[in-house]
Amino acid sequence: MEMLSGSEMIIQSLIDQGIKYIFGYPGGAVLDIYDSLKSTKKIKHILVRHEQGATHMADGYARATGKIGVVLVTSGPGATNSITGIATAYMDSIPIVVISGQVSSSLIGYDAFQECDMIGISRPIVKHSFLVKKTEDIPITFKKAFWLASSGRPGPIVIDLPKDILNSYNKKPYIWPIEVNIRSYNPITKGHSRQIKKAIDILKLSKQPVIYAGGGVISANCHNELKELAEKLNIPVTTSLMALGAFPGNHPQNLQMLGMHGTYEANMAMHYADVILAIGVRFDDRTTNNVKKYCPNATIIHIDIDPTSISKTITAHIPIVGNAKNVLQQILVFINSNMFVKEFYCLKKWWIKIQSWKNKNSLNFDTNSDNIKPQSVIKTIWKLTKGKAFITSDVGQHQMFAALYYSFQKPRRWINSGGLGTMGFGLPAALGVKLAFPNETVICVTGDGSIQMNIQELSTAMQYELPILILNLNNKSLGMVKQWQDIIYSGRHSHSYMKSLPNFIKLAESYGHSGISINTPKELEKKLQLALEKLQNGHLVFVDIKIDASEHVYPMQIRDGGMNNMLLRKNGQK
């Protein structure tokens, strides 16, 4: 059998793992890998324009497909440029594997050219990291890395590869491991039957229950089980920002998103609930507000694959450790076998109360304005795409408008940086999604601040012919910063106004793309339809939309209050 070099073993390991795409940027420490990559047609490499873009593309690909995204960067600045993307994936539990080059083993620790301690730098923001010290360790290291990235609570893995490992030859034939065993890592996948029985007993007695679904529902692919459980028990469902689409947006039991900018009915239902069934959530501060005032009358049932997430922020009265899909299936088996549904209590009074909160119409906005409302942009694009598009977003007001006004019916259609809140995520993530689903409509919703963080990836889109639609909600300001300054800092605007902006249309055209400008409400739908037609003809279309700069996102929770403390839009209020 032919002996392989370290770099050849890496490529073969990726092939054996079933990897189809690598997002990367070459440099001296990884040129051996790139040389070996050239000899295979089984893996397509996407040459990005910045390593942060590579990590976000891999991230977007992973979120949309449920598969592992792979990144390849060189040592030193190549590795450090990937850090923001790694942290983004870590905060949202997204499986990516980052392969970073390193200086030769004999030079590590001697401040060699483009040396940095990638293992040390990335340690707080990875699920695990590997420094490969022997060429023969490459296959088992890659096998472990991909298994760790996708098992249990998913997350990013870093594999650091000294240059001398890449051009050395193994003394034994290459063999891809059939299985991997890490004694210290054995995630619990099924819930304890005693805890499940406790949870069901509590739910049976509940008068005002709520199901709170988080991103873990999407990671575990248990949206069908969630829907079945909710319908059997007639319990209202609310989702986190990360879980939009895990429960159909148009379902009558859906209270929509909860949290800082969640709907009035979702937050009120959470506050007054007597039982909360939390599935795959981590109770972050944007969904709890003041933890001391959080859902004061609720018994918390918390299902999560990661035991360290349970009772970390909010104490769980009934903790259930396990894969969310397995646990929900266990609950459903118990309910069905015990004819629990037929004897289930009536929640009529609870639904009447919820309807009274819905009647507040907390997502209302002025539809007769002379200026384009960002809500109108999202609702119009939803209408034109029939709610079937993949939507990626950056971070800010536009992110919240997209989350609130584009009703997602399926999981993995909403791609955003929820935990780290990374500006510059939307465009490269959209390219990763488009690569995975070339026949689907992919839309990046962004703002004039965020889009400039990674706008160079327009070049990548042109090189690989990845037609996406970019909706730039342009208010000439850092919208969410400005909103906070208006509401919390008494209107004192400090460095939130973008005085000098590029001509986005000409900028897009300079990369070879199409550009459309929208300035009035009357032309909004017509020009968005035109943009979609151009998109179907294979063009990336950059739509610059001049929106009402005074528009704020409502509802908005009051700082340090309970879930029920919110600011709502009033008549005439911006």
Swiss-Prot record:
Record field: catalytic activity: 2 pyruvate + H(+) = (2S)-2-acetolactate + CO2
Pfam families linked to this entry: TPP_enzyme_C, TPP_enzyme_M, TPP_enzyme_N
GO molecular function: acetolactate synthase activity; flavin adenine dinucleotide binding; magnesium ion binding; thiamine pyrophosphate binding
UniProt: Mg(2+) binding residues: 448, 475
UniProt key word Transmembrane: no
Stored Gene3D superfamilies: 3.40.50.970, TPP-binding domain (3.40.50.1220)
Gene Ontology BP term (one): isoleucine biosynthetic process
Co-factor(s): Mg(2+); thiamine diphosphate
Subunit organization: Dimer of large and small chains.
NCBIfam families noted in UniProt: acolac_lg
Amino-acid positions noted as binding FAD in the UniProt annotation, renumbered to this chain: 153, 261-282, 304-323
Pathway: Amino-acid biosynthesis; L-isoleucine biosynthesis; L-isoleucine from 2-oxobutanoate: step 1/4; Amino-acid biosynthesis; L-valine biosynthesis; L-valine from pyruvate: step 1/4
Note accompanying the cofactor annotation: Binds 1 Mg(2+) ion per subunit. Binds 1 thiamine pyrophosphate per subunit.
Miscellaneous comment in the UniProt entry for this protein: Contains 1 molecule of FAD per monomer. The role of this cofactor is not clear considering that the reaction does not involve redox chemistry.
Entry GO CC: acetolactate synthase complex
Binding site for thiamine diphosphate: 51
Organism: Buchnera aphidicola subsp. Schlechtendalia chinensis
Protein name as annotated: Acetolactate synthase large subunit
CDD domains: TPP_AHAS, TPP_PYR_POX_like
Residue span of region Thiamine pyrophosphate binding: 397-477
Keyword Ligase included in the entry's annotation: no
Leading EC class: transferase
Lineage of the organism: Bacteria, Pseudomonadati, Pseudomonadota, Gammaproteobacteria, Enterobacterales
EC code(s) of this entry: 2.2.1.6
Stated family: Belongs to the TPP enzyme family.
InterPro entries linked to this entry: Acetolactate_synth_lsu, AHAS_TPP, DHS-like_NAD/FAD-binding_dom, THDP-binding, Thiamin_PyroP_enz_cen_dom, Thiamin_PyroP_enz_TPP-bd_dom, TPP-bd_CS, TPP_enz
